[in-house]
Amino acid sequence: MKSPTLNHVAVYVYDLKKSNDFYKDIIGLTPIPEPFHDGKHSWFKIGEHSQLHLIGGAAAVISHVKNSHLCFSVASVDSFIATLTKNNIPFENAKGDANAITTRPDGVKQIYFKDPDGYWIEVNNDTY
């Protein structure tokens, strides 16, 4: 039996424009058409077959735990850190040390930071 594939992840956001800008300009995702055209939805392509769906309308920005996070793989964690630094976005390692990188036992580098709604994002250089 074929394993299921991930179609999309939906994230409920407070300020849709701010989140759109973050995922497009900071994370580097490409916007794609969405079928609703109601001003409450934005969709982005993730890799070859998956999507991120932002849904506006959250009542407030709330705190989230780091263990619940989205993860994006990039070619260079160091280059990505330069983007965060340029945009004054703080990052930390898995333990919570500011401006630090975690290197996993398999050699993958990873960092953590928050999106505009307080959702944790991991960025790593895994090539799987």
Give residue ranges: language-model regions.
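Short, charged/polar surface micro-motifs in flexible loops or helix N-caps
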Residues: E48-Q51, V61, A75-S79
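N-terminal beta-strand motif that seeds the catalytic metal site of vicinal oxygen chelate
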Residues: M1-K17, S68-L70, T127
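Short beta->alpha transition motifs characteristic of CBS
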Residues: R104, V123-Y128
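Core segments of cupin and vicinal oxygen chelate
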Residues: V11-Q51
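Vicinal oxygen chelate
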Residues: L16, L70-D117
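Short glycine-enriched loop/turn motifs at secondary-structure junctions
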Residues: S3-T5, I62-N67, R104-P105
